[in-house]
């Protein structure tokens, strides 16, 4: 995936300069190991983004922060996901996946998110790289060329890491509530998407990370389902599954098969490794 990393940086340079690079959606029909790593990295980021929302609601009640806008919450959830997925410099798989998350945002047509509280996709890509670079500027020097020198990436990383360690993470060694995983039946031709998600281990990895690093106080479920006709085919989090007794509240992270199916069909469009490995 080394060439893809270079292409990703090149694309981000174009995006940050205002150049038009975005590609029309199409089914590439290509399903190889690199493509699956690429898609897995983006899907993993989305799942951990929703986990950020869940932890903000369950542990710190930040989803109801009076001074935060919806955009503030989305930005915080992106930063949360990046910190949780922060790869070690020598972790090739982790590096490939976090760069795939960046590249995945660079594939998104900005107009799709115009009426949503999220930052523009190229900004979300930039922010991921900024935090990764800020965690260890010497080891991630390759990202420096696409980062604005005025961006205090090291300070942003340190601030977010201190927030997560000080407010959210549990160091008691005690086990909170366990996380349930539910793979709903696929419908409408979503069998391959369901199989991909199961094989990827994204939900299981998220469950393990949540249980190991945070003390969950309420019932929590990661559910994968066919969302057509029920909800927007994306990923989302709900802390509104409220019970009469607050102790029985249920927190749910949902991953839609349709989103995964679309990503598998879109593949590495624009990031194909034309020249092979170096």
Q: Predicted segments — roles?
A:
Residues 70-88:
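An active-site-proximal "capping" alpha-helix that borders the catalytic cofactor pocket
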Residues 31-45, 266-278:
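Short pre-active-site segment immediately N-terminal to the catalytic Zn-binding motif
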Residues 45-58, 78, 82, 255, ...:
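Active-site recognition of the HExxH zinc-binding catalytic motif
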Residues 33-37, 42, 58-73, 192-198:
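Second-shell loop/turn segments in exported
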Residues 114-205:
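Pan-zinc metallopeptidase signature
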Residues 10-19:
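Bacterial N-terminal signal peptides
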Residues 222-254, 261-271:
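Catalytic zinc-binding patch centered on the HExxH motif and its immediate surroundings
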Residues 2-9:
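Bacterial N-terminal signal peptides that target proteins for export
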